Amino acid sequence: MQQLTEIVEQALEVIEKASDLKTLDDIRVDYLGKKGKITDMMKMMGSLSAEEKPAFGAAVNQAKQAVQQQLTERIDGLKASELEAKLIAENIDVTLPGRTLDIGGLHPVTRTIERIETFFGELGFVVKQGPEIEDDFHNFDALNISEHHPARADHDTFYFNPKVMLRTQTSGVQIRTMEHEKPPLRIISPGRVYRNDYDQTHTPMFHQVEGLMVAENVNFAELKGILHDFLRNFFEEDLEVRFRPSYFPFTEPSAEVDVMGKNGKWLEVLGCGMVHPNVLRSVGIDPEKYSGFAFGMGVERLTMLRYGVNDLRAFFENDLRFLKQFK
């Protein structure tokens, strides 16, 4: 037992003096390995009596635990010292913020579409999509647009052939929805549309959001209330809003909606009206039982008014100096 005590004291002494992890590992092998000094003490068990063996075995195990615990503590201490020395050498200020990436922002047109979708989504309107290459039935005929209407002219519409064209409005999505779903319906249809026009306030491709509600006893007062609330929500102002009588082939009665600008002038922002009975009949909905309202707005137009942009073409020129303003 005296010999075991001396071995443990010797081990603890060399562990305390060790200055690196490799030396500590060598000490572990020297004392606790298969041929280590403490392990060899177990060979003495054979020369002991039955009464002495339990006490001796317990002493050897305690010796192993004492040496192992000291090794573990010394290893942890050396690792902590190495880390501290490394941090000092590299002179890291951990309080400094990390490097950040130059993150882009949403395009202003995308921001506007999301804002519109959020407002109408809270009122139960579902977003619907449709093809951008459209046939004349869904783009014109079903919308009560006569064969000789100016909107069908080549100078307004991009035709692939007399029956197929790039859609001039997203109203075709409303027709397709009414063909496959029965009232009550509440939908909005955002998307790209195409018209043969290009100047400071028009581009050949632009974005529209059209809305449709069809159910029993839908009336114009509901339409006015929803659009009035939308415009005040969108512009975040208690705007003065007016509805002017107008004409659209697919609605009757029809109106254009204006808001009072900061310059004291009325600004047109969207069109609307009660769905024409002929439109409902074209998709198999009984206009005697159901009524509905529809509205449409140009996304770029609303975006220009909200952010004070004067030239529509700025949205499509990808000038980072312009786009970074909307982060």
Curated annotation (Swiss-Prot):
Family: Belongs to the class-II aminoacyl-tRNA synthetase family. Phe-tRNA synthetase alpha subunit type 1 subfamily.
Binding-site positions, Mg(2+): E252
PANTHER family: PHENYLALANINE--TRNA LIGASE, MITOCHONDRIAL, PHENYLALANYL-TRNA SYNTHETASE
UniProt name for this protein: Phenylalanine--tRNA ligase alpha subunit
One MF annotation (Gene Ontology) recorded for this entry: magnesium ion binding
Named cofactor requirement(s): Mg(2+)
Enzyme Commission designation: 6.1.1.20
HAMAP family reported in the protein's UniProt record: Phe_tRNA_synth_alpha1
CDD domains: PheRS_alpha_core (cd00496)
Annotated InterPro entries: aa-tRNA-synth_II, aa-tRNA-synth_II/BPL/LPL, Phe-tRNA-synth_IIc_asu, Phe-tRNA_ligase_II_N, Phe_tRNA_ligase_alpha1_bac, Phenylalanyl-tRNA_Synthase, tRNA-bd_arm
Catalytic activity entry: tRNA(Phe) + L-phenylalanine + ATP = L-phenylalanyl-tRNA(Phe) + AMP + diphosphate + H(+)
Keyword annotations from UniProtKB, A to Z: Aminoacyl-tRNA synthetase, ATP-binding, Cytoplasm, Ligase, Magnesium, Metal-binding, Nucleotide-binding, Protein biosynthesis
Known partners and oligomeric status: Tetramer of two alpha and two beta subunits.
Name of encoding gene: pheS
Record text on cofactor binding: Binds 2 magnesium ions per tetramer.
Gene Ontology annotations of biological process type: phenylalanyl-tRNA aminoacylation
Subcellular localization(s) per the UniProt record: Cytoplasm
Record Pfam families: Phe_tRNA-synt_N, tRNA-synt_2d
